[in-house]
From Swiss-Prot:
GO terms for molecular function: structural constituent of ribosome; tRNA binding. InterPro entries: Ribosomal_uS10, Ribosomal_uS10_CS, Ribosomal_uS10_dom, Ribosomal_uS10_dom_sf. It comes from Pelobacter propionicus (strain DSM 2379 / NBRC 103807 / OttBd1). SMART domains: Ribosomal_S10. This is Small ribosomal subunit protein uS10. GO terms for cellular component: ribonucleoprotein complex; ribosome. Involved in the binding of tRNA to the ribosomes. Part of the 30S ribosomal subunit. Belongs to the universal ribosomal protein uS10 family.
Amino acid sequence: MQSQKIRIRLKAYDHKLLDVSVTEIVDTAKRTGARVAGPIPLPTVINKYCVLRGPHVDKKSRDQFEIRTHKRLIDILDPTQQTVDALMKLDLAAGVDVEIKL
């Protein structure tokens, strides 16, 4: 598995939960002897929704809601078999979406 790269992309609505998951992944990778590049913060996607307050008329009265999606990128360079096994066994929080590319 030499001269390979594992790219891990994490997404979450809560940035604190995301940072905890990132530190767990980085610590696990460093413990098994792999080099780690990152975490690299990617741009936060902000989705804004505008909703009418009242059920009938009065379009001037509105509420605005937003959802922020935070993203991080981690590159694991020269992973060993122990690194891959440790990452597979790692239990991350439920609110974090993980995408892995080899």
